[in-house]
Amino acid sequence: FQIFSLGHGSVASEIKGRRNTNRPKTLIKITEGGAKFKSYIDGKVFMLTPEESIRIQRLLGADFIVVLDECTPFHVDKKYTKKSMDMSHRWALRSLTEWKDHDNGSQKLYGIVQGGVYEDLRDESADFINNNDFYGIAVGGSLGASKNQMHDVVSSTMAKLRKDRPVHLLGIGGISDIFHGVTCGIDTFDCVHPTRLARHGGALVKPGFYETKNEPVS
């Protein structure tokens, strides 16, 4: 659960430098308690806390789950990024406590490395996640305004992470990004890219992209 799409747009849009001003604004306010947002369906207001985030993911039955965090857009300044990172660290500890209180061994919790595009903040966040009792580590937060910057952030972050935990790259899954991530030591990825292509009649095959929507169905 990243408090990002509620207010800032998608990670893909950020990497491409797009800002969709026509999207309904569902995020109302982020506080120490959690994120208050409005349903785009009926306008009902909800409060998503770190504890509620873990409870929801537990009920979903996911094999690995993540702490609640705020994923800041790349264009915010370092002061805001630091403030957000510190709050996300506190949320991570609350998420960890909630998970431990109900852990039955069927799910694993990942902490999320924050810090945006600022290397010293990334180092600080990596130390925090390394030194707390998470099963795995997710590389999250803003990864930059371009693919090259994203690759640089991932590379420098991976160099700081402990080697005895699995590492997941949040929201990134382009073909070149996967190859780069694996080279850096990333174990798993998640991305809408394959299913988005499929919805539009495409598929990922060697050596690249294949258009299927005009092909006869057998």
Regions found by a protein language model. Give the residues of each.
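Non-catalytic, usually N-terminal nucleic-acid engagement modules in DNA/RNA processing proteins
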Residues: 1-103, 210, 214-215
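Glycine-rich phosphate/ribose-binding loops and adjacent secondary-structure elements
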Residues: 86-89, 102-218
